[in-house]
Structure formats: structure tokens, C-alpha cells
């Protein structure tokens, strides 16, 4: 039987960033091959650093998918744990080591007997940086294994051990990276009339773009426009010719995201026109679409967990954080949910150290749900 805690600790020591998860993939494949030995209803495929494990059903009517992400973050770990990261500047601060371990535990249980329906376990790379789910889908990695229903989880520090939370609508916002560069004309600070100050134009844009959320977004739906980087100029007595802004757009539906993207671009172009200068606007959403749960499937999952002993189900509000599972759920009906890990530290914190008793709880809960879906 798989030692969940040791497996998690092994994975915790070898975090790798997106599409560089070579040791992680090798470790996972070794475990998967041991678990699947002698199981003639199992097939395994790889895609770059990703892995797909397909359990052929005995009388399949559909394919049920379970997705886990496998990448780490470029963070220096500060937990002081004896099994801390052995990769300098890399850490499983988003707790994907837990996600992988739970998936392996569920795979082990699913292999006890051939399921009626097909089951697909996806070990997906590059959730944090490259939208690996989108890359796999667009590259045809699923082939004829593409699920009819897709499920997945993410751990959450502010939920207690034993709590599961989701809803019947949007769980994560869609995110879009924004880069804007104003191009004016540089000059001496004493002669502003001979220059065209990109810093002033960019500053004007920052104030004007605040109207997008306050005046273009339905307050009930919500959206966020935040610029965290503003770079302009090199010294105090020179008018700069360029100003660079780097920010993010977040919205709970794709329609709202597209509206906000359009308005941000329009405001930037309007400001540039008013100041008689050029502007470049780069909007990059990629695969980070809103994670929109299928209402009927979400209700089914919520009802199932609500009746499970040891599980407290919470109907939770959406989070404005992003998650690339949204892309796959835009192609396949499915559900994502939160699993409580009761940590004082937020996700991506260098001291993140979740409670390991969650592993057994997660495996028991998820495997029982997948068993139900596989038998329908």
C-alpha cells in the first residue's frame, strides 16, 4: 500500500517549475508503473513532462477524468523541514506535492478492480506559468482519452482539515496579464514643451483606468484591474520618452474578462491619442480562463460530499485567484473544489507546511467519489 506521507515528502524535495518537471515525472512514472503492474486494462502516455493514465472500463459509457498539477514555484523554501526542497530556489509552495500524492492514492484505489466506466488520471505540468492544460489540449495529447467529465481539487490554507468547499458556478477568476508601453519624446526637464512626457501620460492612464471597474463592470459580477509595476525615467532632470506598466485583469466570467480587456485597451489608446504619442498594449490571457463549474455536476458532487462522514461541505464564494483548469473546463464539463489544509501561511508562502493528515482524508473522499462516477 502506498505510503502517502513518504510519497508527499519525496515529491516535496524535488520541486520543478513548469515544463521542467523531469525528476517529478520520473518519480511519478516509477510509482505508477509499480501500481499498474499486471493490470491489463491500464495504458500510460506521456506528453513532455505530463502523464496520462487511462483505465479502460469493462462496460464504458463515458470517461471520467481526474486532473492534478505537478509543478512547483521559483521560491526559496523557509520551512526548515528535514524533507525541505533539495532544488535551490524551487519549492512546492502551492502544495502541488499534496495534489500529486492524493492523485496517486486515488489511482491505487481505482486499480483494485476494473471500473465500469473509463477513468483518466492526468498529471499536468506547468499550471503556474504556461497553462499546461491548454498546451496539452491544443497539442492533441488527450486523443481518444478526452474525458466526458473532468474533476480536480486545490488545497486551501484557510479551510480546516476535513472541510471541502465549492459552488455551482465560478470557483476561480480568469486572469489576464497586461503590459502597456507609452512612447513619447524625451528631453531636458527645463524644456518640457520640446518633449512629450511618457511618464505623465502613463500616470494619467493609471487614474483613468480605474473607471473601468467602477463604471463598466456590473457590481454584482465584479472584476479587478491592478497595475503592480510602473517603470519610467532614469534621473530627476530628464523627461523620459517611455513608460512601462505591468498589471493584471481578473474577472469571474470570460465575457466580463473580454469586456474589461477591451476597455483597458481603449482607455490606453485614448490617453495616447490625447497626449499625441504611441502606445503598445499586450494582453495575455492564454489558458487562464475562469474555472466555471458545471452546475448539475457540481450539485451532484456537493450532495455526495455533504453526506460523507468526516467531511464538512461549504458552499463558497469565488476566489479572484487564477487556475488553468479553467481552460479544460471550457472544453469539458466538470467541477473543481477546495480541500482544507489548515495552515497559517498563504499559498505561495515560503513557510507553507500543510497538515499531512489531509492526505488520507483527500484520498478517501476523492476515491469514493470517483468510484461512484466510474460505476454509474
UniProtKB/Swiss-Prot annotation:
Biological process (GO), any one: lysine biosynthetic process via diaminopimelate
Annotated transmembrane regions: none
Active-site residues per Swiss-Prot or TrEMBL entry: 69, 128 (proton acceptor)
Principal EC category: hydrolase
Its EC number(s): 3.5.1.47
Catalytic function, reaction form: N-acetyl-(2S,6S)-2,6-diaminopimelate + H2O = (2S,6S)-2,6-diaminopimelate + acetate
Keywords: Amino-acid biosynthesis, Diaminopimelate biosynthesis, Hydrolase, Lysine biosynthesis
Pathway entry: Amino-acid biosynthesis; L-lysine biosynthesis via DAP pathway; LL-2,6-diaminopimelate from (S)-tetrahydrodipicolinate (acetylase route): step 3/3
Domain of life: Bacteria
Gene Ontology MF annotations: N-acetyldiaminopimelate deacetylase activity
Keyword presence, DNA repair: no
Listed Pfam families: M20_dimer, Peptidase_M20
Family designation: Belongs to the peptidase M20A family. N-acetyldiaminopimelate deacetylase subfamily.
HAMAP family recorded: DapEL
Free-text function comment from the UniProt entry: Catalyzes the conversion of N-acetyl-diaminopimelate to diaminopimelate and acetate.
Protein name in UniProt: N-acetyldiaminopimelate deacetylase
The organism of origin for this protein: Streptococcus pneumoniae serotype 4 (strain ATCC BAA-334 / TIGR4)
Organism ancestry: Bacteria, Bacillati, Bacillota, Bacilli, Lactobacillales
